[in-house]
UniProtKB/Swiss-Prot annotation:
GO terms for biological process: translation. One of its GO terms (molecular function) is structural constituent of ribosome. PANTHER family: 30S RIBOSOMAL PROTEIN S16, SMALL RIBOSOMAL SUBUNIT PROTEIN BS16M. It holds the Pfam family Ribosomal_S16. This is Small ribosomal subunit protein bS16. GO terms for cellular component: cytoplasm; small ribosomal subunit. Coiled coil: none annotated. Belongs to the bacterial ribosomal protein bS16 family.
Length: 88
């Protein structure tokens, strides 16, 4: 099964997440199929907080990929995908 999920990077107490497409059996920071964006929860005012390729997300959702709850909430919070298209 394929999932859209977060992969943690960055420094201690200052996380930086990559939004990835990965097999469920892969470890959190392990092998992934494609990187479709990033999320920086500690971005400063002049920095980009989130970047997502919505076309690639839609492509993988059509192929049967599932989203984690955190990804679903991020997509709705930053209005990258309408909440009508979100099904988990």
């Amino acid at each position: 099964m394929i999932k859209i999920r977060l992969s943690r990077h960055g420094m201690k107490k200052k996380p930086f997440y990559q939004i990835i497409i990965a097999n469920v059996r892969s470890s959190r920071n392990g092998k992934f199929i494609e990187r479709v964006g990033f999320f920086n929860p500690f971005a400063k005012k002049n920095e980009e907080k989130i970047r997502i390729s919505t076309k690639r997300i839609q492509y993988w959702l059509e192929k049967g990929a599932k989203k984690t709850n955190r990804i679903k909430n991020l997509l709705i919070q930053f209005k990258k995908i309408s909440s009508n298209n979100i099904k988990i």
